[in-house]
């Protein structure tokens, strides 16, 4: 497979909702461990040095205290996002199992998808568009529009080239939006993402011609 399409006789992908869950939790868990140790150390020294010392320090280092509070608020937000994404993952997995009973038996049946691009990490199975590393899904018969966002990484390979990855958003007829994220830890180095995205959009135009498709660079 070059720029999308069915996989044919190539190497089969091992699909794993558990792996998607682990990738989702790495960032928040590592942050929780780091800031947990930091907070424990802070409390220990506060008790050891005495409250009066820390009251004086707060008066003299007010901006530091604000930074400390902001860091922990960010941690709480990260944990909330992890819980929310896990609930969404559970819902997506259940929806796929309900629509396609064969996936209840074996997720590897996704290798028989109607459209499969392992470089872009997307496939179309039945009536669902799936980013299979994160198990984000869109139910195509109820979609009115799909946007592709060509996100640039902060790391530049050279002066004129930068690492980019594609994320998708699906808009439904009722106005709701569903984000389809590719794997955040994957680096799309040396891959013509625009060509892969165009191949996917060509397939969607041919098979789901009522969906509006748009790209944002």
Give residue spans per PLM region.
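Short, exposed beta-strand/loop patches in secreted or surface proteins that constitute
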Residues: 120-125, 138-139, 170-171
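Alpha-helical transmembrane spans
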Residues: 16-89
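Beta-strand residues in well-ordered beta-sheet regions across diverse protein folds
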Residues: 125, 131-132
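Charge-rich, solvent-exposed alpha-helical interaction surfaces
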Residues: 57, 95, 99, 199-203
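Acidic, Ser/Thr- and proline-rich intrinsically disordered linker/docking segments
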Residues: 150-217
